[in-house]
Amino acid sequence: MPRPPERDPIVQLDGPLTSVAWSSAFVAQSLEVLFVYIAPDGAHHLRPIHAETLRIGWPPDRKPGEIVMEAVERYELTPVLVHSTSWRHGEGRLILTYVAAVEPPADLTHYLADERVARADLARGDAFGPPPEIGVAQVLEHAFRHLAWLVKDDAVVGDRLSDWAGFLDRYEPEPFRAFGPGA
């Protein structure tokens, strides 16, 4: 049977987001992407149907923000702001977490699950080490506290998240919590 011409593929598949494999046995750095949006009932986290968060292999020659934007596009979301919010060591690799603030999706791809975000206590370690466990709810809490600070301190973030100001007012910016309320 003759092979179809390359310009007329039988099935068009999207290429991989990165060429770096993601595997629990692969020691490397990886990106964690938290897609979030604001709805009348509060914040929502869009996660892959197969996992708590989206994890993407991150080759050292690529800019992480570009990889995150490719993921936003892949899941057919409309970005508002993409920002690195935290990092941690876990599962034998460095995990850099990005929060991707997106518009509420009109039609959600069947590859994503939509979950309402609840408040959580932050994971805290001791003076010489990280917390023994860090859950997704704690990473999201940290991300919203980080954005609550940036929306007031960074003009670009403040402009892009102006519609989020009322929601973010509920979060005490993390750098100032130690000084007491309203510091």
Please annotate each region the language model reported.
Residues 1-29, 37-39, 176, 180-183:
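Actinobacteria-biased recognition of intrinsically disordered, low-complexity terminal regions
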Residues 2, 22, 26-80, 86-93, ...:
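Conserved Nudix-box catalytic region and its N-terminal flanking loop in Nudix hydrolases
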Residues 45-56, 88-183:
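Nudix hydrolase/Nudix homology domain
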